[in-house]
Amino acid sequence: MKTMLLFPGQGSQYIGMGKDVYENYKYAKKAFMQVNKELNTDLTNLIFNGTEEELKKSYNTQPSLMIVSIAIYLALKEEYVDKLDELNICGVAGHSLGEYSALCASGCLSISETAKILSARGNEMFKCADNNTGMLAVIGSDNKTIQENINSIKPKCLVIANSNSIGQTVVSGYLEDIEKFKIQMEGKAKRLIPLPVSGAFHSPLMQKAQDNIKNEIEKLDIKNPKYPILQNYSGEFETEISSIKTNLQKQITAPVLWCENMQNAIQQGFDTFIEIGAKNVLTGLMKRIVTEEQKEKIKIINIENVENIKTLFDKINND
């Protein structure tokens, strides 16, 4: 067994996420309290009792998803103590902001440091967002076709932002370009789904946010990782602190090539993928990334609540 832990990104959040873990594991609860103190706000109350509208603001979403993921990770360690070593965790990865959760789980950053940088990152991205920009999910096409059709409309700014799985890609840019692209893609994709976001994330339109957060990332006191980080920007397993920082800085305007990254992990022998956090988005993507031949050898599991935690080894042993 060679295990990779996966941490979700924006879009997986919902009101009430992580509540049963908070109520049942002392270290998970302590982690929530740490974030409240660091950010000087009752983020826990927002996560459990707030509104979707407030939670989806990126300066709230990003630290919220991180703390839920880390609370679940700490609950796993509390539940299994030394038994967790049996998983043979050899790497971690996160989708966009999830990369910071991965860094925290790997011991590179403290919970407080991670919450602080994600709050700042989310705030810069929120300020950089524009009502005239957005994102569109393209289902049932391929990146070559998508890129050719982007080129054909000669956009002001429209780029592939996320290559999520086989047949699922997200484009990001100006709404006027997205509308032209939708017309161009008629008959070339199964579905085109506008995403409920107020910005063109992972595109050049986020350059100001990237510039503004660069110094904050540079100042981070990143420790050597316990597990190598498969980073979004480079697509490589990183352990060097300077490389980790550079990739974090460049990630905001660069595409998340998740599909390619996960294929890389499979090629390097990873056979067990455990998503830790709200919902099961990455689990669903992973099931579409693996080939029919690989499905027999690869285990894909998501953990987002107490029941999932307590049945983890049953799933691993029985699947």
Spell out what each predicted region is.
Residues 266-267:
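Non-catalytic positions within long, well-ordered alpha-helices that form the structural scaffold/packing
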Residues 259-263:
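Short hydrophobic/charged patches on amphipathic alpha-helices used for structural packing
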Residues 69, 214-217, 239-258, 297, ...:
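Non-catalytic peripheral regions of patatin-like phospholipases
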Residues 1-148, 272-294, 298-309:
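FabD-like malonyl-/acyl-CoA
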Residues 10-12, 39, 106-253:
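Alpha/beta catalytic cores of group-transfer enzymes, especially the acyltransferase/condensing modules
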